[in-house]
Every structure is written in structure tokens, then in C-alpha cells.
Amino acid sequence: MSHNTFGHLFRVTTWGESHGPAIGCVVDGCPPGIHFTQAEIQADLDRRRPGQSRFVTQRREPDEVKILSGVMQDGETLVTTGTPISMLIENVDQRSKDYGEIAERYRPGHADYTYDAKYGVRDYRGGGRSSARETATRVAAGALARKIVPGMVVRGALISMGEKEIDRANWDWDFLHDPENPFFTPDPKSVSEFADYLDGVRKAGSSVGAVIEIVAEGVPAGLGAPLYGKLDQDICANLMSINAVKGVEIGIGFQAARIHGEENADEMRSGNDGYPRFLSNNAGGILGGISTGQPIIARFAVKPTSSILTPRRSIDRKGAEVEVVTKGRHDPCVGIRAVPIGEAMVACAIADHYLRHRGQTGKG
């Protein structure tokens, strides 16, 4: 097992390294007859693309996707054929020379030591396979996953950065698409505060973490299976696989441990449409590992990147004690570009469970 594949029926295999000639993915299990355009895939990639503001890495990658297999032209759109869909993204702005000094040194907080401990060799150029560069391929796969579940909408937002938090009373999904919003924040009033805060962090050569919230609406009840195929289990696994993610919660998550049962349990009434009407959504749209039909809500915490200009104590491959300064082009807050990545990983998990549910029950 190489552990480069996730999903059961909607299976995604990614390949490539940060400073290799290209990265890509193969999506296997996508049903035939799904219509989409290459522009739709590209639009999601453009949201994750580096170099779009002073608040993210200045590496200039166009991230232009090439779809190599698994589709046919059908008028103005492409249609899936049911065979593996292969997508490729070329790397065009690598600067491997920036990493020469850390070829033999372990960067604190990075996967340098653990990759060496496991494989006995590591690609020091931009982190190789452990780089978030790989996540562009997940976003491409996620754009396809959005097409699998009819009526599903998956959106994400950055809700805190370091010690700064949004005001949820100002939440506006439409503001995410505003050209004056480089942070994927749903709170228009938070932009200037985030900008001033991150400018200070960036100029100090440091970094900061963030919390991202993902909301999936239009997900039917019944997806997921006990006990070892829970929907929230796979959502958490997908989100935890993203670089720098150190925690995931569903619904109110850890807050549930601080309240009483009568506060936590989502009460129900009969709805006018014949379906239950929940009076709250503390469970985040999942009970017993199975979707309730309410919006699925997940949050994940992203640590500050360890690629900073502050000298840090470490060792080299021979065990000698050294100081490490990480040069190159890095995000002062990797949480910003993690928003579309989180959306993609949640979309992939739900699409996979939708196909599994349809196969098991005949419902879809």
C-alpha cells in the first residue's frame, strides 16, 4: 500500500512533488454521464492558486489543468465515460536553489526528519511530496466530486486567524467572491483587521495559523454507515490529510463536552415537507455516522507554517546541532489557501458516500 489514494468508490490517487515537472491525479469510480466544463475545474483551482496577493506565497503557478482521459466532448461540455479521469498540472515556477542549505538539515516543525526516518531519503526541494503544492490536485478532484451529489453545495470560510476572529453576526457567503477579500472571510468587517495583523506577521518573517469552517448543504439523509464507515469519520480523515491540519471537529465539536445533554441534543418536529425539522444543528448534520439532511458543518485547525525567517535550533542528518532559517517563498498563513482545499476534501468524502449509499440501498 502506497497510501497515495483515498476514497472507496470515488477514488482519488494523487502524484507528483513540489519541484517536479508536474503534479496530477487520477479519479477512478466517477460515474458515466456527469457533465462539466474544464472552466469549472479551473475556477476552483484559481481560488487556491498561489501568488494572488501579498498574503500568500509569491510562487507564480498558473495551475492550468489538462484533462487527459475519462471524458468525451458533448457539445459545449465534457461528459464522463466511467473510465479513470486523469488530470495534470505543470509546475512552472520552481526555485530549488532556495532550498540548498536545508538539504542536510532538518527544519523544525516540518516533515523532513520523519520522511528521512521512514524512507531513508527525502526530497528537500520545497518539501517534495509533503508540500501543499500537491493539494492542487485534490482541488481538481473535488471540483468533479461536487457534480456527483445532485443539489449539493459545499462552501468554506476562514473564521479565525491567529488570535483574530470574525464576527459571525456579519456572516455573508456572497462576500467570499468579493475581489477585495483575499482571506475567504465571510465577515466584510474583518478584512482590514486580518490585513493589518498578517502584514505585521509577514514583515516579522513569521507565520500564523487559522481555523476554517466548511458547510455542505443539500446533502440527503442516510449517507454513511455504522460502525466503521461513518461519514464524519471519513470527512475527518480527509481533512486531517491536508498539510498542516492539526485538529478537526464536526458540528459544535469540542464545545459539546462543556454543555449538558439537554443543550446538546438537536430536538425535532414534523416538517411541512414530510421530513423531520431539526430545531438546532449541534451535531453538524451527522448522527451515528449518518447524514441527517441538515447542513454538514466541519471545522479544521491549521498550524502556523514552520517556514519562517526566525533562526530555529535543529540538527542535521549526522546529528550535529545547527540553526535553520527557511528561505524561499512561503505563505505567512497557509490557512487562507486551505479553504478551497477543505471544500474539495469534504466534497470528495460526501460524493464517495453518496455512491456507496446508492450501491448498498439502491437509493440516490
Swiss-Prot record:
Pathway: Metabolic intermediate biosynthesis; chorismate biosynthesis; chorismate from D-erythrose 4-phosphate and phosphoenolpyruvate: step 7/7. Reduced FMN (FMNH(2)). InterPro entries: Chorismate_synth, Chorismate_synth_AroC_sf, Chorismate_synthase_CS. FMN binds at residues 129-131, 243-244, 288, 303-307, 329. SUPFAM superfamilies: Chorismate synthase, AroC. It catalyses: 5-O-(1-carboxyvinyl)-3-phosphoshikimate = chorismate + phosphate. GO terms for cellular component: cytosol. GO terms for biological process: amino acid biosynthetic process; aromatic amino acid family biosynthetic process; chorismate biosynthetic process. GO terms for molecular function: chorismate synthase activity; FMN binding. Its cofactor is FMNH2. NADP(+) binds at residues 48, 54. Coiled coil: none annotated. Keywords: Amino-acid biosynthesis, Aromatic amino acid biosynthesis, FAD, Flavoprotein, FMN, Lyase, NADP. It comes from the Bacteria. Belongs to the chorismate synthase family. Homotetramer. This reaction introduces a second double bond into the aromatic ring system. NCBIfam families: aroC, PRK05382.1. This is Chorismate synthase.
